[in-house]
């Protein structure tokens, strides 16, 4: 159960810059990534720590700006508690999908289709000198379309928003912080990791979903082993009682 909740939100492969927070998407040979045998899909991502505000409630969160195909990758429809996966409309209107606990911290409620709850968002400006009378934050509004439920970390900290809108808020143009890759079922993540590393080079870090959540997966396996040992012990005790 624990593994499925983490693995469904975490793409099979994640690429980040080795020594930088962000990188220009033009540094990536997208054609070669597409040509890698076993790549099911990929999505560009931009993650940033932000502050969300609703009325008098202020909460720290992680904004994840992604392309719409990322929602399919994380099986968003199976994890929506309320609302829908509406992300970007043809008229340009954009919507966010927020973790259930984060929504509760803000004391906000999912509105009707015609009146989406509005959340204020603040992100620190980069490389500026703080001066009196000038705000050190970029700011904007996110209309909430859906509430998602995965695991404690996602539920308490994450909010999804279209990549283009996240870039506009953060004053980026072609920067990314992550690339998320889904791998076809018959291809191992470790095998795909090796292929991707050859494409992106030494300036990037490539990790499988297991490597990103290694402690969680190991803990889950340890818990299963403990349960098995307990069951064996109970079975042995029961056998002795029957013999007696």
What spans do the regions from the language model cover?
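Short aromatic/basic micro-patch
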Residues: 65, 97, 160
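Short, solvent-exposed hinge/capping segments at secondary-structure junctions
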Residues: 69, 75, 98-113
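Peri-transmembrane interface segments
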Residues: 185-243
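Basic-flanked hydrophobic alpha-helices used for secretion and membrane insertion
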Residues: 112-203
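Alpha-helix/helix-capping structural signal
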Residues: 47, 69, 101, 164-165
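Solvent-exposed, non-transmembrane alpha-helical starts
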Residues: 21-26, 53-55, 71-76, 92, ...
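Hydrophobic, regular-secondary-structure patches
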Residues: 1-62, 68-92
């Amino acid at each position: 159960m624990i593994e499925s909740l983490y693995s469904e939100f975490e793409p099979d492969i994640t690429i980040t810059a080795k020594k930088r927070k962000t990188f220009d998407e033009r540094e990536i040979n997208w054609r070669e990534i597409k040509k890698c045998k076993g790549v099911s899909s990929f999505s560009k991502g931009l993650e940033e720590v932000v502050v969300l505000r609703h009325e008098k409630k202020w909460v720290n969160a992680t904004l994840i700006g992604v392309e719409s195909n990322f929602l399919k990758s994380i099986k968003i429809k199976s994890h929506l508690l309320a609302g829908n996966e509406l992300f970007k409309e043809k008229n340009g209107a954009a919507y966010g999908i927020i973790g259930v606990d984060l929504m509760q911290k803000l004391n906000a409620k999912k509105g009707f289709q015609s009146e989406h709850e509005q959340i204020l968002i603040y992100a620190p400006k980069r490389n500026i000198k703080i001066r009196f009378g000038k705000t050190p934050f970029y700011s904007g509004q996110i209309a909430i379309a859906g509430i998602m439920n995965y695991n404690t970390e996602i539920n308490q900290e994450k909010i999804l928003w279209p990549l283009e809108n996240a870039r506009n808020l953060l004053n980026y143009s072609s920067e990314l912080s992550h690339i998320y890759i889904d791998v076809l079922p018959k291809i191992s993540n470790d095998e795909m990791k090796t292929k991707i590393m050859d494409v992106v080079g030494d300036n990037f870090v490539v990790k499988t979903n297991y490597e990103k959540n290694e402690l969680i997966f190991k803990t889950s396996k340890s818990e299963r082993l403990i349960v098995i040992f307990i069951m064996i012990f109970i079975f042995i005790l029961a056998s002795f009682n029957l013999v007696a």
